[in-house]
Amino acid sequence: AIENNGGVVVCYENCSGYKNFDRLVDAEADDIIGAIADRYLKIGCSVMTPNKNRYELLGRLIDQYNVDGVVDMSLTACLTYNIESKSIGKFVTEEKGIPYLSVETDYSKADVGQLNTRITAFLEML
């Protein structure tokens, strides 16, 4: 829906997106098991509390890609991302000073119309 309405997706920050490649395991560490554990525990995932690493990553990505607005897409079944969307929205709008839209989907065809309407309106205000 974003591309179909003239927008450009510059980064996909979720469980299968950029965050998997952000922090690699330090292969030179003396304690390789500790380095592996450190890498996994520092992933900015919504199940981590506090989740400062996700905010830090989002801030870097917004700056690096010169983002005009954030569409935070979460799956209906991912309750931790849904709960965190309010604080992410506050971070994006107040700390980074750009518009934010939170959308929830189950990837069904029934969602297409609503998502298209919401994303079109969001892109028009950018």
Give a label for each model feature.
Residues D72-L75:
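Conserved beta-strand positions
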Residues C78-E84:
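Glycine/threonine-rich flexible loop motifs
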Residues T49-N66, E84-S87:
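A short, acidic, amphipathic alpha-helical segment used as a generic capping/interface helix at domain edges
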Residues A1-P50, R54-L57:
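Redox- and metal-dependent alpha/beta enzyme cores, enriched for Fe-S-associated oxidoreductases
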Residues K86-L126:
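Peripheral docking tails and interdomain loops at the edges
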